[in-house]
Design a protein with these regions (language model features):
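Conserved Class I S-adenosyl-L-methionine
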Residues: 167-191
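Conserved beta-strand signature within the Rossmann-like core of class I S-adenosyl-L-methionine
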Residues: 151-160
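Class I SAM-dependent methyltransferase SAM/SAH-binding core
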Residues: 48, 60-108
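Conserved class I S-adenosyl-L-methionine
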Residues: 43-53
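A conserved beta-strand element that flanks and buttresses the S-adenosyl-L-methionine
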Residues: 124
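Class I SAM-dependent methyltransferase Rossmann-like catalytic core
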Residues: 2-42
Length: 226
């Protein structure tokens, strides 16, 4: 079992149909969608969410962007069950069944179906990198670069450091708590992630400030040179 799993069912008990709820969803989904909407509201193609957790975000965003096909994923079986429960509850035709994707595997892939359009329009990652080893950040960016179409986007939401420093005392305290729980966890620096993206052909294109001292990092797939 991958060691960076956070078990949402321990925070809020599951609903009778198996749906789990994460406390952060109610606080952040509107703000995250506001950041994503200019890119995704009217887009077409396929969007993969990695580390979907409870499945609440992907269900909500699939409702708001019906022209896209949304593909949730996670590594933890109870989360996969919750994602499927949210999918069934939503009744959305553009929300696919969850896939098991382990970002600790550097060669992870998205499994297409006969209706998929090929390369991904976007990859979405919400609140994962600070509760995961550094290799997960490496794997996320390298895998997104492999599987995004030209001009496709990787969106990464969460708390980050900038220029080697925390952006708020609350983030510094949170980082210390995470590292005390697991030395491989902690807030990642934007510059380090930007370097990964540059090396992978997925340069950092935008940094979007968000409420509660969070950011959305937008990486854009470079045009392939033939």
């Amino acid at each position: 079992m991958t060691e960076f799993v956070v078990e949402f069912g321990k925070i809020v008990p599951p609903m009778p149909d198996g749906r789990l709820q994460g406390p952060a969803f109610a606080r952040n989904h509107d703000a995250i969608w506001t950041a994503l909407a200019p890119f995704l509201r009217d887009a077409t193609g396929d969007v993969l969410e990695v580390g979907s957790g409870t499945g609440e975000h992907v269900s909500e965003f699939a409702r708001r962007a019906p022209r896209l096909v949304w593909w949730p994923s996670d590594v933890y079986p109870p989360h996969l069950a919750s994602i499927e429960a949210w999918r069934r509850h939503s009744g959305l035709a553009n929300l696919r069944a969850p896939q098991r994707i382990d970002l600790a595997d550097l060669d992870w892939t998205w499994r297409r179906d006969e209706q998929s359009g090929g390369a991904l329009t976007a990859v979405l990652c919400i609140n994962v990198l600070h509760i995961a080893p550094w290799r997960v950040a490496q794997s996320l960016i390298a895998g997104a670069a492999r599987q995004l179409r030209e001009r496709g986007r990787l969106f990464v939401y969460g708390p980050f450091k900038r220029d080697g420093a925390h952006t708020a005392p609350s983030n510094e305290a949170f980082d210390a708590t995470l590292r005390a729980e697991n030395p491989d966890w902690g807030l990642r620096d934007v510059d380090d992630l930007a370097a990964l993206g540059q090396d992978a052909g997925l340069p950092l294109a935008d940094i979007m400030p968000m409420p509660a001292n969070n950011l959305v990092l937008v990486f854009a797939r470079a045009l392939r040179q033939d």
